[in-house]
Amino acid sequence: MTAFLDFEKQVAALDRQIAELREMGDDPTLDIEGDIARLEDKSAKLLRDIYARLTPWQKTQVARHPDRPHFKHYVAGLFDDWMPLAGDRNFADDQAILGGLARFRGRRVMVIGHEKGDDIPSRMKHNFGMAKPEGYRKAIRLMQLADRFGLPVITLVDTSGAFPGIQAEERGQAEAIARSTEQCLALGVPMVAAVVGEGGSGGAIALAAANRVLMFEHAVYSVISPEGCASILWRTSDKAAEAAAAMKMSAQDLLALKIIDRIVPEPVGGAHRAPEAAIAALGDALEQELNGLSGLPRDTLLAAREEKFLAMGRA
């Protein structure tokens, strides 16, 4: 059953009524199909209306929804011949960032992304998608491997940010993030990044300095979380909604600001309500972007990527 967000209470109430009527439908003396159909139409219309006018803070809640597809779901739904690659060849294998070789609609690619996990044990295993230095160094290693063999790189970004623990800082978290960003910019092969949920701070940009940056319709991408921004500006996280609006972190705002290149539409009610449709939509968008980049000379890819990021913030 779908976990409803706080702004979906009316939809939740209608769905409960539908469920109750369905239970009564087992009684052969009752004819309630018409009532169920009317309630389903009302629920669908209400859901469309709500999602057509989501605030940035509400989009943040959708992007964080626990049932939203994660990296492993995209790998299972879009890629064949998946061969995971592990370790940074220096310290450890960070499970917050996964990556490996795969075949995507006929072409060999390198796929790298954040994995948050689905339940408590897996979220602990993947550290809620918050990577440590060894995770970013693993990503660097895989990008270098892709560059060596001429494989396009696809990255799927979904993290609240890099892990801020003392051990991560002692092992060079800032340096690892910077090196990963640098490696993205130095790739001589096509690179397409997609923000599929949260895109938080340097932990996100380290995998997103790509030729083309895509975002799901209800994903968010920012330098800090709304709660963190509110705590700095207003000394309270209670103003997270105001912070989210001020930071322009939605896909629509970022497309207008030319931070991203394309918005991938989500099913009505968010990717968590129809994961297969969302995964297919992302696959189509990735294929189109790779088709546009394939065959371009190395120098052209490098120059275009560099200019893209240097142009950000210019008048």
Curated annotation (Swiss-Prot):
Family annotation (SUPFAM superfamilies): ClpP/crotonase
InterPro entries associated with the record: Acetyl_CoA_COase_a_su, ClpP/crotonase-like_dom_sf, COA_CT_C
GO molecular function: acetyl-CoA carboxylase activity; ATP binding; carboxyl- or carbamoyltransferase activity
GO BP annotation list: fatty acid biosynthetic process; malonyl-CoA biosynthetic process
Localization terms from the record: Cytoplasm
Enzyme kind, highest EC tier: transferase
Its EC number(s): 2.1.3.15
Gene3D superfamilies per UniProt: 2-enoyl-CoA Hydratase, Chain A, domain 1
Annotated CoA carboxyltransferase C-terminal domain residues: 39-292
Reactions the enzyme catalyzes: N(6)-carboxybiotinyl-L-lysyl-[protein] + acetyl-CoA = N(6)-biotinyl-L-lysyl-[protein] + malonyl-CoA
This protein's pathway: Lipid metabolism; malonyl-CoA biosynthesis; malonyl-CoA from acetyl-CoA: step 1/1
Major place of residence: cytoplasm
Keywords, sorted A to Z: ATP-binding, Cytoplasm, Fatty acid biosynthesis, Fatty acid metabolism, Lipid biosynthesis, Lipid metabolism, Nucleotide-binding, Transferase
One Gene Ontology cellular component: acetyl-CoA carboxylase complex
Subunit structure: Acetyl-CoA carboxylase is a heterohexamer composed of biotin carboxyl carrier protein (AccB), biotin carboxylase (AccC) and two subunits each of ACCase subunit alpha (AccA) and ACCase subunit beta (AccD).
PANTHER family: ACETYL-COENZYME A CARBOXYLASE CARBOXYL TRANSFERASE SUBUNIT ALPHA (PTHR42853), ACETYL-COENZYME A CARBOXYLASE CARBOXYL TRANSFERASE SUBUNIT ALPHA, CHLOROPLASTIC (PTHR42853:SF3)
Family (UniProt): Belongs to the AccA family.
Described purpose of this protein according to its UniProt entry: Component of the acetyl coenzyme A carboxylase (ACC) complex. First, biotin carboxylase catalyzes the carboxylation of biotin on its carrier protein (BCCP) and then the CO(2) group is transferred by the carboxyltransferase to acetyl-CoA to form malonyl-CoA.
Protein name per Swiss-Prot or TrEMBL: Acetyl-coenzyme A carboxylase carboxyl transferase subunit alpha
Source organism: Sphingopyxis alaskensis (strain DSM 13593 / LMG 18877 / RB2256) (Sphingomonas alaskensis)
Gene name linked to the record: accA
